[in-house]
C-alpha cells in the first residue's frame, strides 16, 4: 500500500506525536517511526538511527508527565515531506504555573506506510515578557 502524504495524515501523525510524548508509551512512540528512521533532535545534532534507538532516546530523560503540552500543525506538504509549526508549553511541577514556551518547526519525511522516516527539529524559546 502506498500512503499519500496529506494534511490529514500529517495532522494525525502530529497528534500521535503529542500523545506519545504525554504518555511515554513505548509502543505509541515506536508506531510513529519507520524501522530505519533518522531522528535529529536539532539541526546540528547527529541523528538517532532506527526505531528502537529513537524509542530508547525518548525514554532516557523524559519530561515530568503533566508539566508540558503542545500543539503542532502542518504548514507545507510536498511529495513525502512536510514542514510543521507549533508551540510547546512547559509548566512547573504543579502543572499550572507557566514556566517556558518554545516555538517548534519539524521537517518530516514519510515512507509509503505513512510512518516518519526522517524527523528534524528546530526550536526557539519564546521571550518571557
Where are these regions (language model features)?
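Short beta-strand segments in beta-sandwich/barrel cores
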Residues: 37-39, 89-90
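Short, low-complexity N-terminal intrinsically disordered segments enriched in polar/charged residues
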Residues: 1-35
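Structured beta->alpha junctions
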Residues: 18, 43, 74-76
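A short gly/proline-enriched turn/hairpin at secondary-structure junctions
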Residues: 38-48, 61-63, 122
Amino acid at each position: 500500500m502506498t500512503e499519500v502524504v496529506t494534511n490529514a495524515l500529517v495532522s494525525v501523525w502530529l497528534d500521535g506525536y503529542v500523545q506519545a510524548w504525554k504518555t511515554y508509551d513505548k509502543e505509541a512512540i515506536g508506531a510513529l517511526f519507520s524501522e530505519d528512521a533518522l531522528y535529529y533532535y536539532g539541526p546540528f545534532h547527529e541523528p538517532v538511527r532506527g526505531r528502537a534507538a529513537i524509542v530508547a532516546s525518548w525514554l532516557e530523560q523524559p519530561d515530568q508527565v503533566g508539566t508540558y503540552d503542545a500543539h503542532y500543525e502542518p504548514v507545507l506538504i510536498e511529495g513525502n515531506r512536510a514542514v510543521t509549526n507549533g508551540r510547546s508549553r512547559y509548566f512547573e511541577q504543579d502543572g499550572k504555573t507557566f514556566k517556558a514556551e518554545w516555538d517548534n518547526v519539524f521537517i518530516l519525511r514519510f515512507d509509503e506506510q505513512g510512518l516518519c522516516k526522517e524527523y528534524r527539529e528546530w526550536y526557539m524559546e519564546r521571550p518571557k515578557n
